[in-house]
Amino acid sequence: MRYLFIPIILAVLASCGSDLEPQTATPLNGQQLADKYLIVDTHIDVPFRLHRQPQDVGVATDSGEFDYPRAVAGGLNAPFMSIYIPAQVEEDGGAKALADELIDLVEGIIRQHPDKFAAAHSTAQIDANFKAGLISLPMGMENGGPIQGDLNNVSYFFDRGI
């Protein structure tokens, strides 16, 4: 009985061959893929970086890992701006104020460079900005310190674009 399965397995394997022609289309290269598809980075620490060292990320910068020219070169369409609050600031009671300042910095980038960046509070806005050739700057809060134990602050930060 055991030897009966060997011819059956061989017959099944032989029937698994493909008569398809080899693919003749040239595959897309990295740049073509970046131009065609939306690329999202879910964590960019630019707001806190700018809080510590103000600079214009709409042009090439010498420090940090994000600026407009590098985003364009890498095909980055939607870098989530991380509203990061260090634990010490939370302990000192200044978390909400710092979060507001960091959100203001992101909004300032958009105001300063409306030809390069746009706000994005939904996937539809990210898609529309992509089609318009703008880099979306959605925001995400890295920790809950700015909520300060008050659930009303969840709505407050939602209204601010988080």
Task: Pin down the residues of each PLM region.
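N-terminal hydrophobic targeting/anchoring segments and the immediately downstream early-domain regions
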Residues: 16-162
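Bacterial N-terminal signal peptides
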Residues: 5-14
